[in-house]
From Swiss-Prot:
Gene3D superfamilies: FAD/NAD(P)-binding domain. Keywords: FAD, Flavoprotein, NADP, Oxidoreductase. The keyword Transcription regulation does not apply. The gene is ycgT. This is Ferredoxin--NADP reductase 1. Homodimer. Its EC number is 1.18.1.2. The lineage of its organism: Bacteria, Bacillati, Bacillota, Bacilli, Bacillales. FAD binds at residues 37, 45, 50, 90, 125, 287, 328.
Amino acid sequence: MAENQEVYDVTIIGGGPIGLFTAFYCGMRELKTKVIEFLPKLGGKVSLFFPEKIIRDIGGIPGIAGKQLIEQLKEQAATFDPDIVLNQRVTGFERLDDGTIVLTGSEGKKHYTRTVILACGMGTLEVNEFDSEDAARYAGKNLHYGVEKLDAFKGKRVVISGGGDTAVDWANELEPIAASVTVVHRREEFGGMESSVTKMKQSSVRVLTPYRLEQLNGDEEGIKSVTVCHTESGQRKDIEIDELIINHGFKIDLGPMMEWGLEIEEGRVKADRHMRTNLPGVFVAGDAAFYESKLRLIAGGFTEGPTAVNSAKAYLDPKAENMAMYSTHHKKLVHK
């Protein structure tokens, strides 16, 4: 190994919710930790696309805005002062003769570590934009691929195109404050949580199925109406709007990690029940992980992160305890 290089016990790739909580738990296990995040700020997909979305599937928290959750996770992670690197994508992976792992960043910077925890979600995310020549001219006006501020839609006629969790959740969040909310989905069935779909259908939200968004009609100021088409009959309708939200999913790219020799299944990194990958010293947690009966919730990732940390600790020190002491007894936390 090159001399005078700082070597970390754990380097976490990804600074989203799971990466942040994993960094906290690394501190509980007294592991020297670095977090590398591709984006210019921490929080991952939650900060980027869902800062105002209310998250309700974390035990003990009836509901919390995405941005508030991230702020609390950042504060928690900072307890043990992990080093944070932003605006850097990890492109290279190399193992030296002494077992040290060298990660290369997008600008050529080398990061030396004894273990790696992949908490990078599904990799880099890019929204699936509406396939229309007009979409680009309306982006930044009244065409949106996410909701940054709920109040911006107050008293507006809103159309949401999509049928997954995000589309359903935004419909429910906006229904009390918008003048009207219309959801356009190309299938009869929705992909959201059953209770959320039921809530939407029992509210004032207008649901159009099976319809697809076909055309944007407007001028230099923005979209004035949209044309939707019935996927079976071909019947078309024009809907006057003030704001259009498109939730057509994401393009997912694990990027250079696909070349590291990791076992990949269904676009995710295959893990065992200890969150170990097929590469020694490399672990995974959160949406990046694949295993049987995987639970795709933040709450599930909050369990996987500590499991990965405990496995990393055992990898570094086979005589170590299986898990950290309870946080209520930790010397850095007992007076907080």
